[in-house]
UniProtKB/Swiss-Prot annotation:
Function of the protein: Nicotinamide/nicotinate-nucleotide adenylyltransferase that acts as an axon maintenance factor. Axon survival factor required for the maintenance of healthy axons: acts by delaying Wallerian axon degeneration, an evolutionarily conserved process that drives the loss of damaged axons. Catalyzes the formation of NAD(+) from nicotinamide mononucleotide (NMN) and ATP. Can also use the deamidated form; nicotinic acid mononucleotide (NaMN) as substrate but with a lower efficiency. Cannot use triazofurin monophosphate (TrMP) as substrate. Also catalyzes the reverse reaction, i.e.
Gene: Nmnat2
Activity modulation notes: Inhibited by P1-(adenosine-5')-P3-(nicotinamide-riboside-5')-triphosphate (Np3AD) and P1-(adenosine-5')-P4-(nicotinamide-riboside-5')-tetraphosphate (Np4AD).
EC code(s) of this entry: 2.7.7.1, 2.7.7.18
Record text on cofactor binding: Divalent metal cations. Mg(2+) confers the highest activity.
Full protein name: Nicotinamide/nicotinic acid mononucleotide adenylyltransferase 2
Binding positions for ATP per the UniProt entry: 24, 271-274
Highest rank taxon of the organism: Eukaryota
Length: 307
């Protein structure tokens, strides 16, 4: 498959990130490597979305601290970004709402038609909302260029800080190449872009707990968006899926990363990291990046059992 015929993917991870660990970052890397190896996907970006303060989890430090730690953890990555939208809302947001927000945001920022897993758009079009007196995002009057994956991610990076806290309306997009020499309307090569929820097997397992998730939300998350699961502690994701009728129904929309089941980062967790910090355990350097450790010590976070 050529680059333009592959599905372009943005991986979105929601969670407490209390604190963000090396395991979280490796989850992104392992998922990207696995999707690339399938030959069907190109991962063009990753988004870390920390949960709102009102989530109510015991020991959850403020979003201000968690956002800073997340930013420190991804500062050397050229494709993973931290998004504060969820933290900046008036109250806690469901995972479904976060996915829908980012789908709408990507439509506005990139000009892509984002398709659902089950009902992919047959003719995704690249371009800009049809507003008067506006120039297409990718238009260049001198050198016509295609909106490549790198340009899409770059545009996201340029605009995210400006509009991340605004929920844009859903619109259709078209792109017209106003090339005076050709005098004709051209359509750029089609690029299909999807946002997939990235999670560990623990979140997948939570889908099986009766009453914990809204079933309508689960239908949207798994049925419309799709999930990439990176198993932890050698968990059997296939066995977990068999315990949920919705997961079984949309099992083709759930991609389980099957690489090294003994990956050292698969046993790293925020809970272990907090305990290591509370007990002065030197193994904390195996769980957290040094900039995150330095910030935690400077801010006196997780020093006692209450967080």
């Amino acid at each position: 498959m050529t680059e333009t015929t592959k599905t372009h993917v943005i991986l979105l991870a929601c969670g407490s990130f209390n604190p963000i660990t090396k395991g979280h970052i490796q989850m992104f890397e392992r998922a990207r490597d696995y999707l690339h190896k399938t030959g069907r996907f190109i991962v063009i970006g990753g988004i870390v979305s920390p949960v709102h303060d009102s989530y109510g989890k015991q020991g959850l430090v403020s979003s201000r601290h968690r956002l800073i730690m997340c930013q420190l953890a991804v500062q050397n990555s050229d494709w993973i970004r931290v998004d504060p939208w969820e933290c900046y809302q008036d109250t806690w947001q469901t995972t479904c709402s976060v996915l829908e927000h980012h789908r709408d945001l990507m439509k506005r920022v990139t000009g892509c038609i984002l398709s659902n897993v089950n009902t992919p758009s047959m003719t995704p079009v690249i371009g800009q909302p049809q507003h008067e007196n506006t120039q297409p995002i990718y238009q260049n009057s001198n050198v016509p260029t295609k909106p490549t994956a790198a340009k899409i991610l770059g545009k996201v990076g340029e605009s995210l800080g400006r509009i991340c806290c605004v929920r844009p309306p859903v619109e259709r997009f078209t792109f017209v190449d106003e090339n005076a020499n050709l005098g004709t309307v051209m359509r750029y090569e089609e690029i299909e872009l999807r946002i997939l929820l990235l999670c560990g097997s623990d979140l997948l397992e939570s889908f099986c707990i009766p009453g914990l998730w809204n079933e309508a939300d689960m239908e949207v998350i798994v049925g419309d968006f799709g999930i990439v699961v990176v198993p932890r502690d050698a968990a059997d994701a296939d066995r977990i899926m068999n315990h949920s009728s919705i997961l079984r129904k949309y099992k083709n929309n759930i991609m389980v990363v099957k690489d090294d089941i003994n990956h050292p980062m698969s046993v790293v967790s925020s809970t272990k990291s907090r305990l290591a910090l509370q007990h002065g355990d030197g193994h904390v350097v195996d769980y957290l990046s040094q900039p995150v450790i330095d910030y935690i010590l400077k801010s006196q976070l997780y020093i006692n059992a209450s967080g």
